[in-house]
Amino acid sequence: IWATVTNFGERPGINGKLQRFADEVYRASNSEYAKYMKGVGILPEGINNNPVTYELLLELVWHKDRVDVDQWIESYVTARYGRITDEIRTAWKMMLKSIYSSEVGYQEGPPENILCARPALELKSVSSWGRLAKKYDRDLYKKAAFLFAKAMPEFNEVRTYRIDLIHFLRQVIANEADSVFYDMITAYQEKKVEKFEQEVSRFLMMIDTENELLAQDPFFRLSTWQQQAKDAGNTAAEKKNNFHNLMMLITYWGEHVTSEDNLHDYAYKEWAGMMNTYYKERWLVYFDYLRALLRGEEAKAPDYFHWEREWVEKNLHMADDAPRMSLEEIVNKVTDR
């Protein structure tokens, strides 16, 4: 079986080397080993992201000829949204040249979001085996996402469009947060207090903006998954255990032993109800620590190992993650319209 692992821990983010997937399956099925090849499969640790990747991979087995993804994407988009427009078509073609391009190199799942990282002055990943670096053309991707958003008046009632719109704009925020973080840390290191506070405010505002964006659909709300965890239990004890396990898995993933600390954020989630609580609160703890150092005080570095576990125990309840704005309002805010 030709297969690929495209996701670890069902971590969020957009990625998929679509043309490379198509070319590699075609190459394998026409090689000297073709007689041993019995099919095409997917091996992700979660499938609630990047649907285009799975749609393509699981369709390839039915194609004898090489698939040109630039052409294939039109049929995919038409099927996903019920119809296609010039704006939608152009936006997706731009994504094929940016976020869905076949960049060279190995990576374990999508590039990550620094807003969700355990705070530090230097950050290269959120999870231990992930990466923050985005190697595609981020400016082109942003243009594609904003163009996709322009179709909202026509596609607002199509849920698959809304889910993709939220996901695409969420990625724009994640991408731009990298530079805000850099400016913030630079200001701290240069002891420019006023500039540091300005960038901290921008950083926290990005967390709040993303939280409101994600709240626009139940698919991106923590409460949706909390309810599923509870519903999977048959008894009160099972429901309670499932609920705790969910909150543990999406935060620190482990027991109360420091040797397991490398699994923190392995299955981090960008969900409404997580962005404005867990991730924001963790950053606030860090910013207070940096402020103390800027004042010349002796301050103890945050103990995230215990803080994360205490946070889970204090938040074993349904999240308050309902939207406060309309989808149109938050989309206009993200796209500066």
Residue ranges and their predicted role:
Residues 1-96, 100-105, 109-112, 116-138, ...:
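Catalytic-core regions of glycoside hydrolase
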Residues 2-8, 148-151, 161:
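Generic detector of short, locally flexible boundary/turn motifs and exposed helical patches
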Residues 135-158:
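Long, amphipathic alpha-helical regulatory blocks in the mid-to-C-terminal portion
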Residues 150-337:
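Mature N-terminal, pre-catalytic/accessory segment of carbohydrate-active enzymes
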